[in-house]
Design a protein with these regions (language model features):
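Generic, well-ordered alpha-helical scaffold segments in large soluble proteins
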Residues: 51, 55, 99, 103, ...
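Flexible, charged surface loops at secondary-structure boundaries
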Residues: 57-59, 80, 125-128, 323-325, ...
Length: 492
């Protein structure tokens, strides 16, 4: 909850964007962003509601469905824009439903907007004629979605012939439910987080919207990650428009620029559908034809080891629970790569160590048995044997630390990844990726490669998140390209 001293400042934060939704503003102040995040409640700024309605304002709809209506910002604006259309607002949260009804009464729209309290994924929606599905679906990460709903998502996608990851967020469930409900002539216009444009779980959504089965992409506008759309949520954002039952045609792509949807390009529907990442088509400058050698041809890119509970397995500085022979010096903080601690022997000696016990504890020398017994008792007391990772690791205590790679790569931040050589053979946990040469590589060649990558890697080659944050998965690193001349020294 937010303390009284913060209320005025918080209200000022929302007031400029709410266009008179005082009830919604008050709700956001009373329930801070962290408490709302679990339910995916982030109210849409009024200017974006209007821009999305501008996108479809020249068309006629008989029914407009606000999917995950919150306090009704889309429903109320749509009722004013489309005075003849039937407006349906669907919201599951009982408190928001009460605020929505209150707002409709205050706006004199109680008879224009039908409110349905329930889960959009399963409620029956009364509709007639051509229907528009619009809104800001709740953004709930897969960690907070029950196994039952993950199964629902996978099976419903499978019924459409689409393989879907259970790691998808709740917003993808709403996109699926809308697509299932659409008939020829219907349309959708949503603002969602933008991760699905590029990442693995998003491939199902990209197939759903761009696969040509029944939907056709119309427009795609991505927010600049450094300029968040929402006042209190550092999430990436994209406005997506798709129609049902129309012939594929060029898709308008661009940016959410200031308070407008700015179209920069027209991309062939087939070209967009075939692209492994869609966000690249929304940038001001489209990528040049690919040249050079993919890094994945030279290196195997591997995530760092997942311990399951770093607090138990990563030994604090000076911690003497285990003999040194039963632990390994490891990179455990991204800052250690940024500061290039691994460049020197003394730097590696200062790294924290990670417990590395053999699977067979009987193999431990007698003089170390008591220390190991004490360490494992402490780890159990911390719950290290009950984490998901430990329960799927046989035996639970054997954290199989990675063989030292030739080089490390940081993978998340508001800067391009940092590439560092590993001459003193440190290991690493999952705060970095490791580069393992597919063939022997000379130290001068490795140095030239890393220097080039540190100088020339574009932040946008990763997966962009809100607040300018970029994440580079192993596949993203493997797809980076280097000129052939870097290998032989003819290109710096």
């Amino acid at each position: 909850m937010t303390g009284p001293s913060n209320v005025a400042g918080q209200l000022a934060l929302f007031d400029a964007e709410s266009d008179g939704d005082a009830l919604g503003d008050a709700y956001c102040v009373e329930n801070d962003a962290r408490s709302r995040r679990v339910q995916g409640i982030t109210l849409t700024p009024a200017w974006l509601v209007e821009r999305m309605l501008d996108e479809i304002s020249g068309e006629r709809f008989d029914t407009i469905v606000d999917c995950g209506a919150g306090t009704g910002r889309f429903a109320i604006a749509a009722a004013r824009r489309f005075p003849v259309a039937r407006i349906v607002a669907v919201e599951q949260n009982a408190e928001l439903v009460a605020l929505l009804r209150q707002r409709l009464w205050e706006c004199g729209l109680g008879n224009r907007v039908a409110v349905i309290e329930g889960d959009f994924r399963v409620v029956a929606i009364p509709r007639v004629g051509r229907t528009l599905f619009i809104g800001n679906p709740p953004y709930v990460r897969h960690h907070d979605i029950t196994a039952q709903w993950k199964e629902w998502y996978g099976l419903r996608m499978a019924s459409l012939g689409i393989a879907a990851s259970r790691l998808a967020g709740l917003h993808t469930h709403f996109l699926l439910r809308s697509a299932e409900s659409m008939q020829p002539g219907d349309a959708m216009c949503f603002v969602t987080s933008a991760e699905w444009l590029d990442n693995g779980y998003g491939s199902a959504v990209r197939t759903l919207l761009g696969g040509g089965a029944c939907l056709s992409m119309i427009g795609l506008w991505v927010a600049d990650p450094a300029q968040p759309v929402f006042a209190d949520a550092l999430v990436s954002s994209v406005v997506v428009r798709a129609d049902c039952g129309v012939e594929p045609h060029p898709v308008r792509t661009g940016m959410i620029d200031g308070q407008s949807l700015r179209t920069l390009h027209e991309v062939g529907a087939t070209q967009l559908a075939a692209a492994p990442r869609w966000s690249v088509w929304c940038r001001p400058t489209l990528e040049l034809p690919l040249v050079g050698i993919e890094l994945g041809e030279l290196f195997r890119v591997t995530r760092g080891q997942v311990t399951g509970l770093n607090a138990a397995w990563v030994l604090d500085d000076g911690q003497l629970d285990l003999p040194r022979a039963l632990s390994v010096a490891s990179v455990t903080r991204a800052k250690e790569l940024i500061d290039d601690v691994v460049a020197s022997k003394s730097g590696v000696e200062r790294l924290r160590r990670v417990a590395s016990l053999p699977a067979d504890l009987e193999a431990i020398p007698d003089e170390h048995r008591d220390a190991v017994t004490r360490f494992l008792a402490r780890a159990r007391a911390m719950g290290a044997d009950q984490t998901y990772i430990a329960r799927h690791r046989k035996p639970w205590h054997a954290v199989d630390m990675r063989v030292p790679p030739a080089a490390f790569v940081s993978y998340m931040g508001r800067r391009p990844p940092v590439f560092r050589a590993n001459p003193w053979r440190a290991s690493f946990i999952n705060i970095a990726h490791g580069l393992y040469p597919r063939q022997a590589i000379a130290a001068p060649v490795l140095r030239r490669l890393l220097d080039h990558l540190n100088t020339c890697t574009d932040l946008h080659a990763g997966r962009m998140y809100g607040g300018g944050m970029a994440k580079f998965e192993p596949g993203d690193i493997a797809r980076l390209r280097v000129p052939a001349g870097v290998l032989d020294g003819t290109v710096a």
